[in-house]
Swiss-Prot record:
Name this protein carries in UniProt: Photosystem I assembly protein Ycf3
Function noted in UniProt: Essential for the assembly of the photosystem I (PSI) complex. May act as a chaperone-like factor to guide the assembly of the PSI subunits.
Record's bilayer topology term: Peripheral membrane protein
Start and stop residues of the TPR repeats: 35-68, 72-105, 120-153
Taxonomic path: Eukaryota, Viridiplantae, Streptophyta, Embryophyta, Tracheophyta
Length: 169
């Protein structure tokens, strides 16, 4: 049974209904519609924690999607799945690919910063303050870029940047 017919969550059902309407009324090439269907099913599976299924759908959407902007969101979501699975190196690869296609994707910059910050915290726990500082500096760079694109967002990151003296360096 297609995922679009299995949604139990109200938000997922609403998204699916709206997506189905858009697929019918917006003129698209057949490949674009199919790519969007896989993307939609990937998002639905991801929201339910079905990460393997989400990845299968996203990879299929990537195979079919030709628009770089749309591909950036698929790549971003693949990165999210890898982040959720604790595969931070893979996640970073996908966030970077998303940013190559769409440099104005603050959420990819934010998630990249979060991973850098996490790695900085790991370095502190391992007794390596120099490596930690390098990771924190990297996190600061990505957060500043994200904040520049979305000034009203990432308040915790803005506070961290101010508290640590990294804001505007």
């Amino acid at each position: 049974m297609p995922r679009s017919q299995r949604n139990d969550n109200f938000i997922d059902k609403t998204f699916t209904i709206i997506a189905d309407i858009l697929l019918r009324i917006i003129p698209m090439a057949p490949g674009e519609k199919e790519a969007f269907t896989y993307y939609r099913d990937g998002m639905s599976a991801q929201s339910e924690g079905e990460y393997a299924e989400a990845l299968q759908n996203y990879y299929e959407a990537m195979r079919l999607e030709t628009d770089p902007y749309d591909r950036s969101y698929i790549l971003y979501n693949i990165g999210l799945v890898h982040t959720s699975n604790g595969e931070h190196t893979k996640a970073l690869e996908y966030y970077f690919q998303a940013l190559e296609r769409n440099p104005s994707l603050p959420q990819a910059l934010n998630n990249t910063a979060l991973i850098c910050h996490y790695r900085g915290e790991q370095a502190i726990r391992q007794g390596d303050p120099e490596t930690a500082e390098a990771w924190f500096d990297q996190a600061a760079e990505y957060w500043e870029q994200a904040i520049a694109l979305a000034p009203g967002n990432y308040i915790e990151a803005q506070n961290w940047l101010k508290i640590t003296g990294r804001f505007g360096e």
